[in-house]
Amino acid sequence: MESFSLRQNYFPRSSHDTAEVFPAPDSLSERERFHQLQQELVHQYERIFPDMTAEKTIVIIPSLTIDQELLTRVSGSVHYEERMLSLLMLLRMPRTHVVYVTSVPIEPVIVDYYLHLLPGITGNHARQRLTMLSCFDGSTKSLSEKILERPRLMERIRSSIPMHEMAHITAFNTTKFERTLSVRLNLPLFGCDPDLLFHGSKSGSRRIFKDCGINLPKGFEDLRDENDIIDALVALKTEDRNLQKAVVKVIKTLAYHKSLLEPLH
């Protein structure tokens, strides 16, 4: 695989240039390109992140990329994107730029509130280094998908990054859509490779603990449906007749729906 330098190939051609060819989403070529970009993140993490005076840009994509049907159950889910406004505190570094992208525009008074919390930096100075962009789309589709559907918006994100500055994407969570966005914007992603996400899941973590011989609560992983759950609970009760309760963990859901305490009578 040929070597790749983000600094040498920083700005790709316009999104509207039909001669520009991107790897197919979720393809091997896209994965290879993504891994090349991630090597640049190593350099940024070691050299640029600790330097408070370095010129850098953080592109914040607060995309809640989870099942759309699940999001429809949450009133005002689009406002979850405001939770990463705390990252505007990065503007306390005087040569740092932030590009913040949302589904719908955030009220200026909310942004001003955060900017006035900055220590030692005036709100006006920080605002000059902040670019707020929006898809103007309040649907339950994830923000990352919305951006990918809008080549002009991606071009605006690119043009908001000062020439020759180091930059990376920070996202709420990482999936194949954030990986594709990373490749399309030619920016490394400050997050886990989506192909490795399973190892940090509840089932994946239990597997790792077992493989390493680490003690962990008795239980089962990789359960797929209601019958699997019933079989697992029966097996636990059969093994320990004194067992009174078991916790059923749900992998892909919102924070307040992750666990169910099941009595075993």
Residue ranges and their predicted role:
Residues 2-207:
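ATP-binding N-terminal substructure of ATP-dependent carboxylate-amine bond-forming enzymes
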Residues 193-265:
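Active-site nucleotide/adenylate-binding loops and adjacent lid/helix of ATP-dependent enzymes
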